[in-house]
Amino acid sequence: MSSSKNTLLIGTRKGLVIYEKRSAGWEYAAEHFDGIPVSYAVSSPDNKIWWACQDHGHWGCKLHLSKDRGANWEEIEAPKYAEEDEIKDGVPASLKYLWVLQPHLNGNAEHVLVGTEPGGLFESKNAGKNFELVRGLWEHPSRKEQWFGGGRDYAGIHSIVIDKDNHDHRYVGISCAGVFETWDGGRQWEPKNKGLRADFLPDPASEVGQDPHLLVAHPVNQKVMWQQNHCGIYRSVDGANQWEDISEPNGVANFGFVITLDENDENTAWVVPAVSDEKRLAIDRALVVCRTRDGGKSWEKLTNGLPQEACYDIVYRHSMDITGDTLAFGTTTGNLYLSENQGDEWMALNHNLPMIYSVRFS
């Protein structure tokens, strides 16, 4: 199946890299913000706005947008916590990291939601001129005592799912807290973690404290949701009311960070496994993508064109995307791969990029 999305936005440790599909194939086209870590980059659904989240280290987080496909960029004031906001009692809240920026689905290209560390969800309806902290989630009674960092100091919102038919219905994925759902635009939230397992907690079935690495919903039937979790791969067919562990009991499809869904088939998904939490590297030093076509009942390895020895690559949670039959993913060691037949065959677009944080088609 062909697609009209012929641009790749690649957020890396040293800038935003652009690839474009031209008559000769996919080619390197441009770079922006050279030398500056771009934690996430994405376009609005209508491609009118490109967004780039940056992590300047000592200088903090910054946010830029472009309304002309990168020809010009405008810096937008990043979301801010109020002086009275606290991560925990006595610990002032301040912006630590921009995890994800999710354009809204309501046709307003300027309407976005931003997930941050230390656990705040922000919303802007005017292209970042004003950001408002979603107080209902920030003030959830579980946050101060039961949310905590997963690989970073504090909890982070890395996944935002908006219901295409009811825009007040939303989900977020939080490391570490779990999946939360709202039906009223963010005023009230409920944890939706039944069936998940957190092996690192005293109570692995705890309602709050789960660690989804990435939460996604099928674009057509959004009741079908998937997550690559710290403790396996999970799927729900009832809008996150109940999760089922679909990891391979004796196979490689288990630990990892990213999960990507077929746009038309709610039973097809791809993951890129790693060894484990303790050993974050390619299994048997061979890069493998796993695909299921039956909702996780079985998984197949896809390795044609991928390195099968002396490979240490892993793929971060936002570093794989799909459009039509075309998949692309980037790795922690700067390798960029693309398949135009749903992963049956892979080609390398680049072996020399910086560490890749995000890959998105536009």
List the predicted regions and their residue ranges:
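Extracellular glycan-interacting surfaces
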Residues: 1-362
